[in-house]
Amino acid sequence: MSWIEPIISHFCQDLGVPTSSPLSPLIQLEMAQSGTLQLEQHGATLTLWLARSLAWHQCEDAMVKALTLTAAQKSGALPLRAGWLGENQLVLFVSLDERSLTLPLLHQAFEQLLRLQQEVLAP
């Protein structure tokens, strides 16, 4: 069992999702309002991915906003990044060094992804 598993498990429980032990290196949670949240462990990094399908008419504006808001000078405390999957799926993500991972940092990263998603989708 990795030392960060209890942190990830507690985070999932805080979101109302029970977990089993041992945790998979890829956890996928369906969020009612914000799409799919994935937590992926790879090497010494934990990446949080927030993916949401958009209507075709939202895609261009969302892509421009996401890239603008995640530019290095505007990314804030955590290095948030944006990407696109397929024809209509906005993907926002942040990679965290496992050595500095704490439960508050995990919550902060998730909250920043949610805020960024709201900003990107705002009219």
From Swiss-Prot:
Functions as a specific chaperone for YopN. It could facilitate the secretion and the subsequent translocation of YopN. Gene3D superfamilies: 3.30.1460.10. It is a peripheral membrane protein. The gene is sycN. This is Chaperone protein SycN. InterPro entries: T3SS_SynN. Interacts with YscB to form a complex which specifically binds to YopN. Changing residue 58 to R: In plasmid pYVa127/90. Keywords: Cell inner membrane, Cell membrane, Chaperone, Cytoplasm, Membrane, Plasmid. GO terms for biological process: protein secretion. It is found in: Cytoplasm; Cell inner membrane. CDD domains: T3SC_IA_SycN-like. SUPFAM superfamilies: Type III secretory system chaperone-like (SSF69635). One of its GO terms (cellular component) is plasma membrane.
